[in-house]
Amino acid sequence: MKLWVDADACPKVIRETIVRAAERTGVECTFVANHVVPVPKRANIHSLQVPAGFDIADNEIVRRVEPNDLVITSDIPLADEVITKGALALSSRGELYTKDTIKARLNIRDFMETMRSSGIQTGGPAALSQTERREFANHLDRILAKR
């Protein structure tokens, strides 16, 4: 199992949790972003900078991901693509996306996108709560323990 992080929008506190888990378990971890993501100098932790552009980082993750890898992302379409390839997808809020739940999440995302494009203010996501941070760390630990 390898860990792939969609680091463009990953909160710093979640990146720190991921780094600690990678250091503790030795799992190979790559942060993919269109900007420099500082990571500690460890043999198993990497940063991959891709060119700026729409979905460039997402496409690179999809290209490299393999079955049973874990992708950390809050990007629903990216989660759908990696699940289709046999990987796991975990949001930075601790939600494990599955084949059973991802289509409903895509429908909600598309509905909200339609609302926004028609001028309705939908607001952004709430700030990351302590409960969500804990949920993320717990899910990540459970997944890494099974590898």
UniProtKB/Swiss-Prot annotation:
Q: Which domain of life is it from?
A: Bacteria
Cite the InterPro entries for this sequence: UPF0178
Q: Name any one Pfam family assigned in the record.
A: DUF188
Q: Which CDD domains match?
A: PIN_YqxD-like
* Annotated family: Belongs to the UPF0178 family.
Check the record and name the HAMAP family matching this protein. Answer: UPF0178
What is the designated name of this protein? UPF0178 protein VP2328
